[in-house]
UniProtKB/Swiss-Prot annotation:
Claim: Cell cycle is one of the keywords in the record: yes
Name recorded for this polypeptide: Cell division topological specificity factor
Alphabetical list of NCBIfam families matching this protein: minE, PRK00296.1
Signal peptide per UniProt: none
Gene: minE
Family matches, as InterPro entries: MinE, MinE_sf
Domain of life: Bacteria
Keyword Phosphoprotein attached: no
């Protein structure tokens, strides 16, 4: 019977199985984009974005050791009628 991979395991490559293709890419970098028709700029102050970065860092470090606050980048921009919140997390290299 095959063992089912969990979401975080498949994303960060923490299972014993060898990583291939997109799993290796996910190990290197996690990118999340959130789009909203409601204006985010009214709710996202610089302080709130910094708090969000710290909370995200705390969660990511439960699964991947060595991620620093400088590895988390959050950008806000408008695209057509949408507000886009883009987050990039540079992950340390996966050691085999």
């Amino acid at each position: 019977m095959s063992k089912k991979k969990g979401f975080w395991s498949s994303l960060f490559g923490t299972d014993d199985n060898s990583n291939t293709g997109s799993a290796n890419m996910a190990t290197e970098r996690l990118k999340v984009i959130v789009a909203s028709e409601n204006r985010l700029s009214n709710r996202l102050t610089a302080d709130r974005i910094e708090k969000m970065k710290r909370e995200i860092l705390e969660v990511v470090n439960k699964y991947v050791n060595g991620v620093q606050i400088d590895d988390v980048n959050i950008n806000h921009r408008s695209e057509d009628s949408l507000d886009v919140l883009e987050m990039n997390i540079n992950l340390p290299e996966h050691k085999k």
